[in-house]
Amino acid sequence: MTQLINVNSRSYRLSSAPTIVICVDGCEQEYINQAIQAGQAPFLAELTDFGTVLTGDCVVPSFTNPNNLSIVTGAPPSVHGICGNFFFDQETQEEVLMNDAKYLRAPTILAEMAKAGQLVAVVTAKDKLRNLLGHQLKGICFSAEKADQVSLEEHGVENILARVGMPVPSVYSADLSEFVFAAGLSLLINERPDFMYLSTTDYVQHKHAPGTPEANAFYAMMDSYFKRYHEQGAIVAITADHGMNAKTDAIGRPNILFLQDLLDAQYGAQRTRVLLPITDPYVVHHGALGSYATVYLRDAVPQRDAIDFLAGIAGVEAVLTRSQACQRFELPEDRIGDLVVLGERLTVLGSAADKHDLSGLTVPLRSHGGVSEQKVPLIFNRKLVGLDSFDRLRNFDIIDLALNHLA
């Protein structure tokens, strides 16, 4: 078996112990802190003694797909190409959903590990990520969302519902993430993969603030699984795809800037196009509202004028040109607009008011997407060495850290 693999200009030492990398969707660090303070996460609390607790930056836009793909490629979106759920194809003049693996421009560490002879397992909460994360992977790969459709031929495992002892959970539930962890434990005990990647959903974080009973119960559940993985002898590495913040005013009303309406009023209809890369089929979570938007300008709209106009709107943190955004956030130039707009911590960006269904938001809006959700945990159940070689820790360094930097 190959002991070293090279993927996207980085080298990875193959582990001799089962290694589990966990992406906790929407894990603002305060969730962990509050759960520990409430006595709900005793295993995580102990990691300061025998593990390593660090903080890193996620990819901006701080959304699920760009960050999960960065983690499994060890590279930013400028390399792997996935910079949101949607992009505007200038050739076809259509908004394109990027859930298909054909939009992935780089190999994954997971697929390369499997090619090197390792048993690799991937369990995601939502099925939208499975095709991307499982691209060219010969191993185990399935989602909790469609666990009842798992087959040995397509997914590398079977009878997962019976093994886990849970029914298929609702997409809009904490149970969807618990299914991921329970399935991971079953795989660890029975198949004992060399490497496992577990990715949850941020349903709880979108609905419940850090320290609330619901949030603490969710983190207590995860903590119990982390402990069981540790007791099974696994190397456990935990990070997040992004943080999470309230996007409301003082009395809980959503702070939304409908950029398409504002731009239409300023320049006229059909002169600009606002695209929200957070948009996905699961809008109940966030109403397709996040703190990042990209804007396409027609020829008649001067770029400098549009920048000044958008930057002058209260709640807008920054407006960047395409080249500025690609340089600062390492994004693919052909998949973002002429401008990138970032909302402040308490503000989300929409397109037009009539394009957003907010009826599913039964609690004050919480979302992500901006720089304000960039800080994420990097937590390990082992001591690490050689960290001086990192100028800046990123969530997509986690596989490198787990495989190459154990003491």
Curated annotation (Swiss-Prot):
<dbReference type="InterPro" id="IPR012710">
    <property type="entry name" value="Phosphonoacetate_hydro"/>
</dbReference>
<protein>
    <recommendedName>
        <fullName>Phosphonoacetate hydrolase</fullName>
        <ecNumber>3.11.1.2</ecNumber>
    </recommendedName>
</protein>
<feature type="binding site">
    <location>
        <position position="242"/>
    </location>
    <ligand>
        <name>Zn(2+) 1</name>
    </ligand>
</feature>
<comment type="function">
    <text>Specifically hydrolyzes phosphonoacetate. Does not have activity on other organophosphonates or acetates.</text>
</comment>
<dbReference type="InterPro" id="IPR017850">
    <property type="entry name" value="Alkaline_phosphatase_core_sf"/>
</dbReference>
<dbReference type="GO" id="GO:0047400">
    <property type="term" value="F:phosphonoacetate hydrolase activity"/>
</dbReference>
<comment type="similarity">
    <text>Belongs to the alkaline phosphatase family. PhnA subfamily.</text>
</comment>
<feature type="binding site">
    <location>
        <position position="25"/>
    </location>
    <ligand>
        <name>Zn(2+) 1</name>
    </ligand>
</feature>
<feature type="binding site">
    <location>
        <position position="202"/>
    </location>
    <ligand>
        <name>Zn(2+) 2</name>
    </ligand>
</feature>
<keyword id="KW-0862">Zinc</keyword>
<dbReference type="InterPro" id="IPR002591">
    <property type="entry name" value="Phosphodiest/P_Trfase"/>
</dbReference>
<feature type="binding site">
    <location>
        <position position="64"/>
    </location>
    <ligand>
        <name>Zn(2+) 1</name>
    </ligand>
</feature>
<feature type="binding site">
    <location>
        <position position="242"/>
    </location>
    <ligand>
        <name>substrate</name>
    </ligand>
</feature>
<feature type="binding site">
    <location>
        <position position="241"/>
    </location>
    <ligand>
        <name>Zn(2+) 1</name>
    </ligand>
</feature>
<keyword id="KW-0378">Hydrolase</keyword>
<dbReference type="GO" id="GO:0019636">
    <property type="term" value="P:phosphonoacetate metabolic process"/>
</dbReference>
<feature type="binding site">
    <location>
        <position position="206"/>
    </location>
    <ligand>
        <name>Zn(2+) 2</name>
    </ligand>
</feature>
<feature type="binding site">
    <location>
        <position position="368"/>
    </location>
    <ligand>
        <name>substrate</name>
    </ligand>
</feature>
<dbReference type="InterPro" id="IPR023116">
    <property type="entry name" value="Phosphonoacetate_hydro_insert"/>
</dbReference>
<dbReference type="GO" id="GO:0046872">
    <property type="term" value="F:metal ion binding"/>
</dbReference>
<comment type="subunit">
    <text>Homodimer.</text>
</comment>
<feature type="binding site">
    <location>
        <position position="368"/>
    </location>
    <ligand>
        <name>Zn(2+) 2</name>
    </ligand>
</feature>
<keyword id="KW-0479">Metal-binding</keyword>
<feature type="binding site">
    <location>
        <position position="64"/>
    </location>
    <ligand>
        <name>substrate</name>
    </ligand>
</feature>
<dbReference type="Pfam" id="PF01663">
    <property type="entry name" value="Phosphodiest"/>
</dbReference>
<feature type="binding site">
    <location>
        <position position="202"/>
    </location>
    <ligand>
        <name>substrate</name>
    </ligand>
</feature>
